[in-house]
Amino acid sequence: MLLEEILKQEQERFIKENLLSDEMLELLKENIMPFNTLMAYYRCAIMEVETKFKVLNEEFSLQYDRNPIESIKSRIKSMDGIFKKAKKKNIPITMEGIEEGIRDIAGVRVICSFPEDIYMLADCLLKQDDVVLVERKDYIKNPKPSGYRSLHLIIEIPIFLQNEKKMMKVEVQFRTIAMDFWASVEHKAVSYTHLRAHETRGN
């Protein structure tokens, strides 16, 4: 997909958004093209990471007649989500502040069959000479109190533009199918609790 097409898609996404605060709308009004471009760069970074895992999966299929990856999911944090996180962490509401201060704008989730595949794939990814590890959090060996388990990596990878190379951060989450199911149930439970609390306050 061409960068121009990605920019157009992001612009349409901005137009459809209607739940932003006045402060966020003012930021976008002043920085709409830089923000669009930044989001497009994150989408490009996601494509790079997805390609790396697809290549690894294909290699294992050819050499060992099995696929360690069950599925690959990706997402870009919403504008409202970016803004709320910036406010919560006192990150400057600027393009530079957002890019430097929020590490999980771009996310890729790799669902594996077995726990050992998680560490094997993480090692394969980090051995690649264009991948830089920024942060590692192992919630498999050290689960959260809720029971949530996953391996989180923040990495930097290059995207190659027309006239430059730009390093972009991507959060990569590794889970088994069972871990992903538990995370989904936990997320729904938290969302339901927040909704009930809001309804109670409203009454």
Give residue spans per PLM region:
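Charge-rich, low-complexity segments
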Residues: M1-E100
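Short connector loops at helix/strand junctions that flank enzyme active sites
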Residues: R103-I105, Y148-S150, K165-K169
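Short amphipathic alpha-helices in soluble, non-transmembrane regions
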Residues: L121-L126
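Beta-rich nucleic-acid/ligand-interaction surfaces
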Residues: Y119, V131-E156
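Short cationic amphipathic helices and targeting signals
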Residues: A106-C112, V172
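Helix N-cap motif at beta-to-alpha junctions
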Residues: F114-D117
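Conserved small/polar residues in nucleotide/adenosyl-binding loops
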Residues: T193-G202
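Conserved, surface-exposed functional patches that form binding/active-site neighborhoods
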Residues: P158-A189
